UniProtKB/Swiss-Prot annotation:
CDD domains named among the record's database cross-references: 7tmA_ACKR1_DARC (cd15010)
Organism per entry: Bos indicus
Side Cytoplasmic, residues: 79-89, 148-160, 223-238, 303-330
Residues with glycosylation annotation: N12, N35, N52
Membrane topology note: Multi-pass membrane protein
Protein's name in the database: Atypical chemokine receptor 1
Lineage summary: Eukaryota, Metazoa, Chordata, Craniata, Vertebrata
Gene that encodes it: ACKR1
Keyword check for DNA-binding: no
Residues in compartment: Extracellular: 1-57, 111-123, 182-201, 260-281
GO MF term list: C-C chemokine binding; G protein-coupled receptor activity
GO BP annotation list: chemokine-mediated signaling pathway; inflammatory response; regulation of chemokine production
């Protein structure tokens, strides 16, 4: 088979060599005056994928490290000792660790180099778990930034279960386009969006752009606006926001690729198309690495929470007025 740089010669190359020997006797002025620029422009543009068959060790290594790291942080979060030491919303941190572990488990199925007779339903399930867990983690981080300390203090009883079911349900719905667009081609589990599923490509790109790009930008904008206006500290900034660094390029590149495919942006040169394909592979590799980084971020959150005092929350208006009344009486 060869590779992108050094293709292996086949029978056709021998035939071409014979034709060249036969045509060498013709005079140079026999050939018409072709424009070499037009010939190069008409040639097909071929990109060498970074995540090809040789990337299988990368997928397996990331999967093993992700499973070990996620299992370790889950064990730490579920220990009874943490129930009184951890001031953060522990259930949200546990869900983030579970999402990272689920993603780590299905990473080898998504590997380009893992060939074999994969059944289509397993491929669909792998993409559902991978993107469903990624969407859920993004929504959980946004939810934790807005309501985490309040829920940890027990000020919103009965809301935690409903929010959990709702967030994971929305994440599953957002992952349906990529699930339906995935297929087993030549024994590999890939996303093709072929045939009648072509429209789902743009829906999937829009979902990734909204969750992985617009959501963190919205959190940053809200935080900056409230800081300038001197309002409440929500959303709370913590190290979990680093998670979006791993998925933000994925949302951007998928959105750009959709614009190119829909002809909204015209890529007229082959190097530009090759650069876009390379960016897509780099963004995918960076997104895969999040399953190793997420447990480390959770470990840092736990370390900070167990070595600092619980966050101070603003008192409700009724409670503040009641305390003022007691102070005036005394």
């Amino acid at each position: 088979m060869g590779n992108c740089l050094y293709p292996v010669a086949d029978d056709n190359s021998t035939k071409l060599a014979i034709k060249e020997d036969l045509l060498i006797d013709f005079p140079e002025d026999y050939y018409p005056d072709y424009n070499e620029t037009d010939v190069e422009a008409a040639a097909p543009c071929h990109s060498c994928s970074l995540l090809n068959y040789s990337s299988l060790p990368f997928f397996i290594l990331v999967s093993i490290l992700g499973i070990l790291a996620s299992g370790t942080i889950l064990y730490a979060l579920l220990r009874p000792l943490f129930r009184w030491q951890l001031y953060q919303d522990r259930s949200t941190l546990v869900q983030l660790a579970v999402g990272s572990a689920l993603f780590s488990i299905v990473v080898p199925i998504l590997a380009r180099g893992l060939s074999g007779a994969l059944i289509t339903s397993l491929c669909h399930l792998a993409h559902l778990v991978a993107y469903g867990s990624a969407f859920a983690q993004a929504l959980l981080i946004g939810y934790h930034a807005c309501l985490g300390p309040q829920l940890g203090a027990g000020q919103v009883p009965g809301l935690r279960l409903g929010v959990t079911v709702g967030l994971w349900g929305v994440a599953a719905l957002l992952s349906l386009p990529v699930v339906l667009g995935s297929d087993t081609s030549q024994g590999l589990c890939t996303v093709t969006f072929s045939g009648e599923w072509e429209t789902l490509r743009y829906i999937h790109a829009a979902a990734c752009f909204a969750i992985f790009v617009l959501l963190p930008l919205g959190l940053l904008g809200t935080k900056g606006l409230k800081t300038v206006l001197g309002r409440a500290p929500c959303p709370w900034v913590d190290v979990l926001w680093v998670w979006f660094i791993f998925w933000w390029p994925q949302g951007m590149t998928l959105g750009l690729d959709s614009l190119v495919r829909s002809k909204a942006i015209v890529v007229s040169t082959c190097p530009a198309q090759q650069a876009l394909d390379m960016l897509l592979d780099v963004a995918e590799a960076l997104a895969i690495l999040h399953c190793v980084a997420t447990p480390l971020l959770l470990a840092w959150v736990c370390y900070q929470a167990t070595h600092t005092s619980p966050p101070s929350l603003p008192l409700p208006t009724t409670q503040t007025s009641h305390l003022d009344t007691l102070g005036s009486k005394s």
